[in-house]
């Protein structure tokens, strides 16, 4: 039986023998494509080639691509763990042809690999072909069917509709018919009873698609019409985990050697055997799947967070923790302990897992611990809602409350339903679904982008000349109109542009496009989309066919360049001061500020921050000249000392920037010499995730302003101390005096409180046999609370304390304390306070024995106190 490692290598070996260039997997986290957060198919890294924006370096390519599908069209998240073949992170084996071979070779080689090389039973294989679509004038794909007829009988070549057998990149763009290969893994007895033909595309767990061959031959325009592609593309994708299942004779992907090591480790950790119970089995599958996704995302530079791609990763991690908490009884962080097993399983194919081991482990552990605390808070909130419902006789938790638990505390509906069922209650699922739909609609509206078709004025590739020039003569190659969030603008592609498109953390250039008559049109930003430099303009030139001058805003560019070069010097200084474990984890470079994220497991000391600043400043004063090396082979660049960053996609040739001993792989723009940075100051140093720190810094004019602001503060403080030459001594003396005075005040307050409490205890006011303490005073609410708890600790009889306090001005408070016997009898301080708070224009709450309310209408205190007395039946 082939192992998963052997299967992966056999695929690469086979297609290498067919003249394919074997390329490494692209990062799972996508940069430079606004339509995608994650790589969800093998074709993503070749999208710019398929769109015609970049010329293919190789016409035949194959790889094993790590993918993630959790959102949008490919939303598999809720299926994961509940069936045998859905995953969040999976590997896609694929082969591509860019204008080389087409359907014949794609089909013949797929069959040869599956049957001849791997030895799959041909009697278990089926192929689907596109049946055609008369509405769009598309005929049946008889060409593909004829090639399949070489290997399969006619009855196992199945017509498929547009939904299943016509692949589209999106609403617009390259598309075409596809041919899926399905395999029937059922036993001979089952196959004899029901023909596999009846189960194709019917979600049967053992009659599954394993390979999709896409024949891209059309381009879908914005008006939905189709035009032929000038260069046809083959794009195939085969689910690696499903292939392993078929070859290893399993009935579930999770029973293969891809997942079983993780599941066995999990069983050992929890003491729960896999196969003992369906709910714990689902939980184990969820955890085994999700730990892979989370680890690879962190490896590729995407940390869990509350925004965009980071939020998706956090959701996946929390889903795994919830399943572990609910069904595997994991009350402490546990997922990070699976990392050694994952590395043993996949570390050979993806060595970055081992290289980033400590960071991945720390990030996951901290995220788990944080969410477990949140989970406990959510459970307490749900318990309160259950108690409130029981008090009113309701047995149904409303959908809004259930959705709040989901949205705020990460409670899935099934966990809420489980806890409710244990308390004889149910949840309003319809109301929950309504709230979920509202949220999805809000998200869709916020992210909706409508892009028209490209208006192509001239054919040709766009050239970037911004490393050498700040203005160039150019022409418009193409443009299109875009609508987003009720705003309209144009995307413009130029034949030759000095504008740097936002990439690698550096913001895009702004500037002007100047026509032949001298009229300037603003370019407010430049973005990178599918390997195109796209210039954003609110208004198009009147004549788009003119020759133009493209001119960047040089001041902003130069400031951004200074900040970008400073990040290189900062990176080197951090590694010198903190150690070589420091690696860049992200950056942001604008004309105003630079932000640098790096791996490090502790807060930097003031001395370390000062040392880093000094090292960067030394290199600025040294005025190192920029040494630039373009089109350097990646291995040669690394031999020069440049470090490749995890999560970045590099070509075979790269650009190297050198300033003194600082050597970096970088595609950004940089100043000619370090002296032009002028000055460098670190503004903040903070944590953004476990094991990842962030420095924000300023350079040049920004650094000068930062220093001036500090000086202004210092001068203002000196002035407050009458320009005393020994300012630190004066401040220390003031703090000592302040502490002494505060202690005297606290002692006086305490003494006053004791006297006031004594006077209360000397009174003996009783109503219905209950001792009543009633007062309205100018006093802090905290003092009233102290009095209440001291009296409660000293008395052994029934009592009620009601206090109305003001601190001067409009602030006021109500305080109510009840003895234990009264709360056991049904009296509730929180309800009394909430009811009376309206008189003081405030609100409050608490527990049955003690509650407070704050308000802004002291004149209402007498009425509030009277209402409490009335409701407690303690009036005269």
Swiss-Prot record:
Its cofactor is Zn(2+). It comes from the Bacteria. InterPro entries: aa-tRNA-synth_II/BPL/LPL (IPR045864), Ala-tRNA-lgiase_IIc (IPR002318), Ala-tRNA-ligase_IIc_anticod-bd (IPR018162), Ala-tRNA-synth_IIc_core (IPR018165), Ala-tRNA-synth_IIc_N (IPR018164), Ala-tRNA_ligase (IPR050058), Ala_tRNA_ligase_euk/bac (IPR023033), DHHA1_dom (IPR003156). SMART domains: tRNA_SAD (SM00863). Belongs to the class-II aminoacyl-tRNA synthetase family. One of its GO terms (biological process) is alanyl-tRNA aminoacylation. It catalyses: tRNA(Ala) + L-alanine + ATP = L-alanyl-tRNA(Ala) + AMP + diphosphate. Binds 1 zinc ion per subunit. It comes from Porphyromonas gingivalis (strain ATCC BAA-308 / W83). NCBIfam families: alaS. The keyword Phosphoprotein does not apply. Its EC number is 6.1.1.7. GO terms for molecular function: alanine-tRNA ligase activity; aminoacyl-tRNA deacylase activity; ATP binding; tRNA binding; zinc ion binding. Zn(2+) binds at residues 564, 568, 666, 670. Keywords: Aminoacyl-tRNA synthetase, ATP-binding, Cytoplasm, Ligase, Metal-binding, Nucleotide-binding, Protein biosynthesis, RNA-binding, tRNA-binding, Zinc. It is found in: Cytoplasm. One of its GO terms (cellular component) is cytoplasm. It is an enzyme of class 6 (ligase). The gene is alaS. PANTHER family: ALANINE--TRNA LIGASE, CYTOPLASMIC, ALANYL-TRNA SYNTHETASE. This is Alanine--tRNA ligase.
